[in-house]
């Protein structure tokens, strides 16, 4: 009985649809306004007004042609494709952080290049238009520091020198880092804690977190770079080292440029001045918050 009622309802629905649609499908067209005279609108435009409009259009056309000629004959903006570096010592400076190479001045972090014409060029090592800073490990430059632990400057406090963008992929958040199974080295369990260690057995800390994947290192962001595992240890919970902490007095003669009794930013090569704001933060804990 229930099936019969359902079939009846379906047939009734289909029949209703067919009846309503047949009115439009099979009905003959009806003309409701046949035989009605065309409506005439009084248009009163004299020939004089039309002539004025045509004259104004011609005048505007000539002005546009003149502007186009001026644009074509204008000199092109100079292309600054070869940056001129006036930087003392051996600091590695990233030019073309946005894919735009420009003239580099002595006051690089504070220069205002707005309005300066630049030419877009492809810079080797760029990822998504940003080239991260290349870090100099002073242990490579000075063998006396080869066995010394070295700290990174905190990019959240001091910024990334030489990169003018708000976000540098060298210090991306964890969710923005490409996923990979690469490991710095095998995980080592020590007293129930499991952390990643580098080739020398030192724990790698960056941005206050233990680095557990090779892709979290700044060098991973640089194209064609070797993903080394011997980055210096960086800890946010310990004060920066002093010269006396790293070498004994007999080796002071080899430390050209490193001042005695002063805390160090060991990523700044010897003989290169540390930016004043960073120096104040290192020595006195002063930051511009």
Curated annotation (Swiss-Prot):
Subcellular location, record wording: Virion
Claim: 4Fe-4S is one of the keywords in the record: no
Positions of the UniProt region annotated as Hydrophobic: 1-21
Top-level taxon: Viruses
GO cellular component, one term: viral capsid
Inducing factors: Expressed in the early-late phase of the viral replicative cycle.
Keywords: Capsid protein, Disulfide bond, Late protein, Virion
Keyword Thylakoid among UniProt keywords: no
Subunit description: Interacts with the major capsid protein.
Entry domain remark: The hydrophobic region might anchor the protein in the underlying inner membrane.
Function: One of the minor capsid proteins that constitute a network internal to the major capsid proteins and outside the lipid membrane. The minor capsid proteins glue and stabilize the capsomers.
Protein name per its UniProtKB record: Minor capsid protein P10
Species the sequence originates in: Paramecium bursaria Chlorella virus 1
């Amino acid at each position: 009985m229930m099936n019969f009622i359902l079939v009846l309802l379906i047939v009734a629905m289909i029949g209703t649809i067919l009846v309503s649609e047949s009115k439009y499908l099979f009905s003959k067209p009806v003309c409701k306004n046949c035989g009605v005279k065309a409506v005439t609108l009084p248009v009163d435009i004299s020939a004089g007004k039309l002539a004025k409009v045509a004259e104004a259009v011609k005048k505007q056309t000539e002005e546009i042609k003149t502007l186009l000629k001026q644009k074509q004959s204008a000199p092109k903006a100079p292309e600054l494709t070869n940056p001129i570096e006036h930087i003392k010592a051996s600091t590695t400076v990233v030019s073309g952080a946005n894919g735009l190479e420009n003239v580099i001045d002595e006051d690089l972090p504070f220069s205002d290049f707005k309005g300066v014409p630049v030419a877009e060029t492809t810079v080797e090592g760029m990822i998504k238009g940003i080239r991260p800073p290349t870090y100099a490990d002073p242990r490579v430059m000075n063998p006396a520091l080869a066995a010394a632990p070295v700290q990174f400057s905190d990019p959240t406090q001091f910024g990334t020198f030489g990169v003018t963008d708000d976000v540098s992929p060298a210090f991306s958040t964890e969710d923005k880092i490409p996923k990979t199974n690469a490991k710095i080295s095998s995980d080592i369990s020590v007293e129930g804690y499991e952390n990643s260690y580098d080739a020398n057995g030192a724990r790698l800390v960056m941005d206050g977190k233990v680095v557990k994947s090779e892709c979290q290192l700044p060098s991973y962001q640089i194209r064609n770079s070797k993903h080394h595992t011997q980055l210096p240890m960086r800890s946010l919970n310990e004060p920066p080292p002093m010269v006396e902490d790293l070498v004994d007095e007999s080796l002071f003669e080899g430390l050209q440029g490193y001042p005695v009794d002063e805390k160090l930013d060991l990523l700044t090569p010897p003989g290169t001045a540390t930016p004043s704001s960073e120096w104040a933060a290192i020595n006195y804990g002063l930051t511009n918050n």
